[in-house]
């Protein structure tokens, strides 16, 4: 009788564990952001010469495979859609947890987003959904996560259960994990029709516009972190954009201002 009870208990526990694992794997948001970051953590430890940090400018404009074919260096983008400067410090720590790159290139458009572009919880989850459990993950969630939804950052299926976002590119993510590496090295993009309206010419334009106070404060805080930690392998960039509207031109001008602030801290 006792043997039968033990056997039944083992079966129940096994079923519960299997159900938990299935929910954990299948009920997560699967999109290009998760596939890209999951792929980053699959890269061999300390195998990357360059890591690029930023938002869509990085993974749509730079090809790690082409860079290797043309110039012989290994690289990977640690980048998510609409990634913003608040998260850069945590992301630097994530990069350093598995890689020791000769260069970390940071595309800084994410320092110029206005409040309308800061749906912060969505952007945070694009990062934390792929992060392995670590002190940095705990610190990041404690600093930026919603107090009422703490559990869902560690168990994403709590958040995405029954959601269409849990399906997304699930087959692609399964293929990634079966393959064990990212075939495209994080690159992603989509086709668009060519813009036929007026494009503002900014060649040689050095005009500046003040950054909002909160934006400048966060930028300076991140730069101070880089300086205090002697991150000599960090360089900053602002990838080119087609400027078609006044608000984009003003962001371009703020980019010029940002460049001057970056120089104040001794960085290029």
Indicate residue ranges for each PLM-predicted region.
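Extended hydrophobic/aromatic segments used for targeting, binding, or gating
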Residues: 214, 221-223, 227-229, 233-268
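Membrane-embedded segments
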Residues: 57-144
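Alpha-helical transmembrane signal-anchor/signal-peptide segments
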Residues: 28-48
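Hydrophobic membrane-insertion alpha-helices, especially the h-region
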Residues: 7-27
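Short catalytic/ligand-binding loop motif for oxyanion handling, primarily in non-cytosolic enzymes
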Residues: 60, 112-116, 166-168, 243-246
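Short hydrophobic beta-strand that contains or immediately precedes a catalytic carboxylate
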Residues: 50-54
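Secreted/periplasmic serine-hydrolase-like ester/acetyl group-modifying domain
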Residues: 123-230
């Amino acid at each position: 009788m006792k043997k039968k009870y033990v056997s039944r208990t083992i079966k129940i526990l096994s079923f519960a564990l299997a159900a938990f694992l299935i929910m954990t794997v299948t009920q997560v948001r699967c999109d290009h952001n998760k596939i890209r970051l999951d792929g980053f953590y699959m890269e061999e430890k300390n195998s990357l010469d360059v890591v690029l940090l930023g938002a869509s400018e990085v993974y749509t404009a730079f090809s790690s495979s082409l860079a290797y074919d043309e110039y012989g260096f290994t690289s990977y983008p640690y980048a998510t859609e609409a990634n913003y400067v608040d998260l850069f410090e945590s992301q630097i720590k994530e990069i350093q947890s598995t890689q020791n790159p000769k260069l970390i290139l940071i595309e800084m458009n994410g320092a110029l987003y206005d409040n309308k572009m800061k749906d912060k919880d969505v952007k945070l989850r694009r990062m934390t959904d792929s992060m392995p459990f670590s002190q940095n993950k705990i610190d990041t969630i404690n600093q930026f996560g919603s107090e009422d939804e703490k559990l869902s950052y560690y168990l994403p299926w709590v958040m995405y259960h029954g959601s269409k976002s849990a399906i997304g590119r699930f087959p692609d993510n399964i293929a990634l994990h079966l393959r064990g590496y990212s075939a495209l090295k994080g690159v992603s993009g989509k086709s668009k029709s060519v813009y036929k309206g007026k494009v503002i010419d900014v060649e040689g334009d050095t005009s500046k516009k003040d950054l909002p106070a909160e934006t400048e404060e966060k930028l300076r805080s991140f730069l101070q972190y880089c300086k205090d930690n002697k991150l000599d392998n960090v360089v900053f960039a602002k990838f080119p954009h087609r400027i078609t509207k006044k608000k984009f031109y003003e962001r371009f001008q703020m980019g010029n201002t940002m460049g001057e602030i970056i120089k104040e801290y001794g960085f290029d």
